[in-house]
Amino acid sequence: MKIALIGYGKMGHMIEQIALERGHEIVSIIDVDNIEDFDSPAFASADVAIEFTNPTAAFANYQRAFAHNVKVVSGSTGWIQDHKAEVERMCTEGGQTLFWASNFSIGVAIFSAVNRYLAKIMNGFPQYSVEMEEVHHIHKLDAPSGTAITLAEEIINDLDRKDKWVKGFQHAADGTESGSNEVAPNELPIASIRRDEVPGIHSISYDSEADKITITHDAHSRKGFALGAVLAAEYTKEHTGLLTTSDLFKF
């Protein structure tokens, strides 16, 4: 398969390594200093472009790739609030293909399934209050993380007593602290901590007077995310439309 990379930071380098190990060809690498290469024959020859950039660049990158009818796999977060409807329209009506996920880790896909199941169980146990915490490296710009938001939305869909998520306690990269996990009964607080070079930790806790249940996904490195992105690209080559991890992993 011919792959184009959009974004060549730590994730881009890791994706390149795994893609080559799996027998794929990298035909184009686009970063901030060569945006004009979107219009190159090499980019247009790609079966799939894998995009990991930042919230401000992602949507424009999708548009540039779609202009050449190149399918996109993206793990960029933070753009959905402003552009979700337009991206959905481009895929459902415009014939384009985007595989988007807030997290491509196989472990997170499994964790997500456990999260949904546990939320359904907790409908029968109203004495448990739920909250979430995510910890990431100091370079991560958005908070809460896209993965935390996805997990929170799953809980809201399956746990009747919660209907919205809100920012909880915040510990910024510069050490400043703000916010609180003390929220209204219908709200799910997400605490965000920026610390050192942590790849990503997501914890969901159900607390009662008697005990506390916590489930956690702790990423040891970016390798799991990169492998998942390449697996998603392999899937996307053979499929069309708006895709996500529930299409790739059937559980």
Predicted features along the sequence, with ranges:
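Short, ordered loop/turn segments at secondary-structure junctions
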Residues: V32, T77-W79, N103-F104, V135-H137
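Rossmann-fold dehydrogenase core element
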Residues: E86-S105, M122-M132
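Rossmann-fold NAD(P) dinucleotide-binding segment
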Residues: S40-A42, A46, F52-G75, K84-V87
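Hydrophobic beta-strand scaffold residues
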Residues: I26, V72-V73, T97-L98
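Rossmann-fold NAD(P)-binding glycine/threonine-rich loop
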Residues: S76-L98, A109, V114-Y117
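C-terminal substrate-binding/catalytic lobe of Rossmann-fold NAD(P)-dependent oxidoreductases
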Residues: K2, I6, K10-F43, G124-F251
